[in-house]
Amino acid sequence: MAPTQNTICSKHVAVIGAGAAGLVTARELRREGHTVVVFDREKQVGGLWNYSSKADSDPLSLDTTRTIVHTSIYESLRTNLPRECMGFTDFPFVPRIHDISRDSRRYPSHREVLAYLQDFAREFKIEEMVRFETEVVCVEPVNGKWSVRSKNSVGFAAHEIFDAVVVCSGHFTEPNVAHIPGIKSWPGKQIHSHNYRVPGPFNNEVVVVIGNYASGADISRDIAKVAKEVHIASRASESDTYQKLPVPQNNLWVHSEIDFAHQDGSILFKNGKVVYADTIVHCTGYKYYFPFLETNGYININENRVEPLYKHVFLPALAPSLSFIGLPGMAIQFVMFEIQSKWVAAVLSGRVILPSQDKMMEDIIEWYATLDVLGIPKRHTHKLGKISCEYLNWIAEECHCSPVENWRIQEVERGFQRMVSHPEIYRDEWDDDDLMEEAYKDFARKKLISSHPSYFLES
């Protein structure tokens, strides 16, 4: 959509969340001339990257009265993307080699990601826009604007009116738990990966881990360091799958899905194998959940599809005053947050115009029909995967910003291939030094780093 020639408007905008999405959204909104208030329940920026050894009071996170811990980070977590392709486009996530307290590895720990986000917030003076320890309890449309009710840690309640609201609250708090026939009578323990922190509690146990992607692959191998046996139940595997993996302790097996959980403590897999397990760990993802949002029925979550959303961002009936940043998965997350937020900021200012409500709905209906034809279930609507860069470049063209760099796209593709083929070593052994070199040369050309690329590549 071509930029408009109308006078640029400045809006009063509420941003919900001060994680990676909220931070870059606040920056882009302010760059576009908007006034911004960011709400976050934590004491510092970083969102889910704020590690806590604490977990929900309910290990499965099903009890609605549970004490909730708003992070899903486990102690051993390292990024599953190379740092140079993970960072924001104009603030590279490069090693702070001169600082011995920092993690200079190419696939660093969660603590290094938090430090990077704190660096970003300081560099762009974002913290001055954030109300820390403040929870948004209700957001609803009122006379063309938005009512935002919040309360802080000492119980002070506030009610304010904003021109627009951008939801950057993430989707890693409300766990999705696998349906297992017979599980109600199964006597063992269950926990969702949201509440997993360290392997110690599983010492000498037989553990079944449901899920073998990202956190499932990591957590199963982490637990295997101390457990007697670890058995992975993978929905992606064929029904007869049964494979013993030699790493890390020769006590790890991959199976097909669970068929039944029995009262005697046994777990029957669809491959016919039976295991007597102490604990089941659900690495089964999360549900989209916006308990504070009241839109009078305009928005619905249907089988984990947030609908109807135009390009995963705008709700046609309330666009552009309500938008979402960061809903899609299987994408270059921080870059996606940045490009989506540039679009939202430009649309709110009037510099870029959205299609009409009818046109946006037509696009959404056509997209849903395409997913149906391809046999993609509703729950995967927001998983981009192979189309992620096409999606991001489409938005970039809309708001006249740079597309995703080729080296970044290739790094993600090759990194994913390594992760699938060598999950134990892909973070420490790689074959794309050429792309890493291209990335640092790109940073140098754009004057985003002060040192010569060789300083980072040879360290």
Swiss-Prot record:
Catalysis: reaction(s): a (Z)-omega-(methylsulfanyl)-N-sulfo-alkylhydroximate S-glucoside + NADPH + O2 + H(+) = a (Z)-omega-(methylsulfinyl)-alkyl-glucosinolate + NADP(+) + H2O
Record flagged with keyword Oxidoreductase: yes
UniProt keyword list: FAD, Flavoprotein, Monooxygenase, NADP, Oxidoreductase
Domain of life of the source: Eukaryota
Class of enzymatic activity (EC top level): oxidoreductase
Tissues where the protein occurs: Mainly expressed in leaves. Low levels in flowers and seeds.
GO MF: 3-methylthiopropyl glucosinolate S-oxygenase activity; 4-methylthiopropyl glucosinolate S-oxygenase activity; 5-methylthiopropyl glucosinolate S-oxygenase activity; 6-methylthiopropyl glucosinolate S-oxygenase activity; 7-methylthiopropyl glucosinolate S-oxygenase activity; 8-methylthiopropyl glucosinolate S-oxygenase activity; flavin adenine dinucleotide binding; N,N-dimethylaniline monooxygenase activity
EC number: 1.14.13.237
GO biological processes: glucosinolate biosynthetic process from homomethionine
Keyword Protease: no
Pfam families, sorted: FMO-like
Needed co-factor(s): FAD
Residue positions binding NADP(+): G211, N212, Y213, A214, S215, G216
Residues the entry annotates as binding FAD: G17, A18, G19, A20, A21, G22
Disruption phenotype: Increased accumulation of methylthiobutyl, -pentyl and -heptyl glucosinolates in leaves. No effects in seeds.
Function: Catalyzes the conversion of methylthioalkyl glucosinolates into methylsulfinylalkyl glucosinolates. Able to S-oxygenate both desulfo- and intact 4-methylthiobutyl glucosinolates, but no activity with methionine, dihomomethionine or 5-methylthiopentaldoxime.
Family: Belongs to the FMO family.
Protein known as: Flavin-containing monooxygenase FMO GS-OX1
Record organism: Arabidopsis thaliana (Mouse-ear cress)
